[in-house]
């Protein structure tokens, strides 16, 4: 009879402990119900990239002096710089410039070390495409500035996320459609 009482006591303790664990899990669930949703309806709502976001590279053809520093500092020697030497002025003249974004690792070395600042990083991150060969941008495609997410009136921007700094939010305060959850 003593073993039966001991077994019942152990069973009761285990049942109480299981109820505590279920209660703890339920409290976590209730805690998460009070939080704001983190889901972003992507095509219609977009995040504002941070100030130091490294997106697609923008190239200014007129500023480039064809020094090829960008090619030397690139870990994968990606930028293709085609130039010819003008013998009358003894200077290089840029003929073409291209970057394949299907291979680019967006490290930003080319932008950082460019002596004439003809390269810059944009906030464009939508580079998805069906054919990878279309990601090879020449100087004309690199020269196009992307439509800013903030200036596009058809898209709501999400700016009250915790990882954004106050400066980046205040810098974009003139946007028309800001979703506050």
Curated annotation (Swiss-Prot):
[4Fe-4S] cluster 2 binds at residues 74, 104, 107, 110. Keywords: 4Fe-4S, Chloroplast, Iron, Iron-sulfur, Membrane, Metal-binding, NAD, NADP, Plastid, Plastoquinone, Quinone, Repeat, Thylakoid, Translocase. GO terms for molecular function: 4 iron, 4 sulfur cluster binding; iron ion binding; NADH dehydrogenase (ubiquinone) activity; quinone binding. [4Fe-4S] cluster 1 binds at residues 64, 67, 70, 114. It comes from Physcomitrium patens (Spreading-leaved earth moss). Its main location: plastid. NDH shuttles electrons from NAD(P)H:plastoquinone, via FMN and iron-sulfur (Fe-S) centers, to quinones in the photosynthetic chain and possibly in a chloroplast respiratory chain. The immediate electron acceptor for the enzyme in this species is believed to be plastoquinone. Couples the redox reaction to proton translocation, and thus conserves the redox energy in a proton gradient. InterPro entries: 4Fe4S_Fe-S-bd, 4Fe4S_Fe_S_CS, NADH_quinone_OxRdtase_chainI, NDHI. Residues 55-84, 95-124 form the 4Fe-4S ferredoxin-type domain. It catalyses: a plastoquinone + NADH + (n+1) H(+)(in) = a plastoquinol + NAD(+) + n H(+)(out); a plastoquinone + NADPH + (n+1) H(+)(in) = a plastoquinol + NADP(+) + n H(+)(out). Its EC number is 7.1.1.-. This is NAD(P)H-quinone oxidoreductase subunit I, chloroplastic. One of its GO terms (cellular component) is chloroplast thylakoid membrane. Binds 2 [4Fe-4S] clusters per subunit. It is a peripheral membrane protein. It is found in: Plastid, Chloroplast thylakoid membrane. The gene is ndhI. Its cofactor is [4Fe-4S] cluster. One of its GO terms (biological process) is photosynthesis, light reaction. Belongs to the complex I 23 kDa subunit family. NDH is composed of at least 16 different subunits, 5 of which are encoded in the nucleus.
């Amino acid at each position: 009879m003593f073993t039966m009482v001991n077994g019942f006591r152990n069973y009761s303790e285990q049942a109480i402990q299981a109820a505590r664990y279920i209660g703890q899990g339920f409290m976590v669930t209730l805690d998460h119900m009070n939080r704001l949703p983190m889901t972003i309806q992507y095509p219609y709502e977009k995040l504002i990239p941070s100030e130091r976001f490294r997106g697609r590279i923008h190239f200014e053809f007129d500023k480039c002096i064809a020094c090829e520093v960008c090619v030397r500092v690139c870990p994968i020697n990606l930028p293709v710089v085609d130039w010819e030497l003008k013998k009358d002025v003894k200077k290089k003249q840029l003929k073409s410039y291209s970057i394949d974004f299907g291979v680019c690792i967006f490290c930003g070395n080319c932008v950082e070390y460019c002596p004439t600042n003809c390269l810059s990083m944009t906030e464009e991150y939508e580079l998805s495409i069906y054919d990878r060969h279309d990601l090879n941008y020449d100087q004309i495609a690199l020269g196009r500035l992307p439509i800013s997410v903030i200036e596009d009136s058809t898209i709501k921007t999400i700016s009250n996320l915790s990882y954004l700094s106050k400066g980046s939010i205040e810098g974009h305060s003139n946007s028309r459609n800001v979703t506050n959850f």
